């Protein structure tokens, strides 16, 4: 069990995602971006693609205050072969948020049309986002 939980990575479905610019505080209605560093911790190359419907991309679920349904976001539309052990920085655009409060964003990689990496044991990055009334 320990090997499966800590070392086994099916195919290329294991990555470490770290925030480059946290904590996040934004004003209502303001556009924002979140930069993350993605490190390939699998033993195979992760193939990012510029096409939206295929390949690997950065994906996120943005959960608003109050438990409403999350908004699904995508980024990382680049042609990039991320070798095992290599890292890259990607920027995730955040939509303007109208409601003040504490949001939560869960960031993962997604193999479009196949699986989110989390489904196969990779740990997503979860961060709070504080949204305050614009001055």
Model-derived features: positions:
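Short beta-strand and strand-turn-strand segments in soluble, beta-rich domains
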Residues: 54-79
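Short proline/glycine- and polar residue-rich coil/turn motifs
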Residues: 78-88
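Asparagine-centered strand-capping/turn motif at beta-strand->loop junctions
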Residues: 38-42
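Short, surface-exposed loop/turn segments at beta-strand-coil junctions that are enriched for proline
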Residues: 94-101
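Low-complexity, acidic Ser/Thr/Pro/Gly-rich terminal tails and inter-domain linkers that flank the onset
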Residues: 2-28
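Beta-sandwich strand segments
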Residues: 46-48, 113-124
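Short, hydrophobic/aromatic beta-strand segments
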Residues: 44-57, 104
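Short, surface-exposed ligand- or partner-binding patches at beta-edge/loop junctions that are enriched
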Residues: 101-111
